[in-house]
Amino acid sequence: MNFIRIMAVLALVTVGSQASAQPKSLRDQIIGTWNFVVAEVVAPDGKKSFPFGETPKGIIIFTADGRFAQIHVASDVPKIASNNRLTGTPEEYATIMRRSISVFGSYSVNEEKKTVTFKIVSSTYPNWEGEAQERSIDKLTADEFVNTNHNVAGGRGSASNFYKRAN
């Protein structure tokens, strides 16, 4: 009888350790808060550019229930001279629009294709509202996340976003 109990306990321990040793899904790994490091656009000719500069600010948050929120801002976006967000000049507004983006909605992860698809509810660029945008997951570790849009508007090449997990 004791032998059977011991074997049963060993079987449970073995099954439990095998289950915990299985790698987390991409979806489980992506959940959390990530600090934006840089966005890199690679043109068809191989030339690289950084639309938010080389030291941007930003964040992307993925929730367990499939929601996301993202903001990217260039570190050199000038303040509005009037100190009133409603009375900026056309030039100030144009700079802000070119040097920042905010978007939120829901997301899904395709484990086989290693992609994340953003279903955009709203954005500071209203043309994206209602779109589904797919990104490849190029790197996803405990501390780093890189995704790439391989179809940047206007045929400008690909755009990769680099993130580090927030503490």
Q: What is the meaning of each model-derived region?
A:
Residues 17-167:
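Lipid interaction determinants
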Residues 6-16:
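Bacterial N-terminal signal peptides
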Residues 1-5:
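Positively charged n-region of N-terminal signal peptides that target proteins for export
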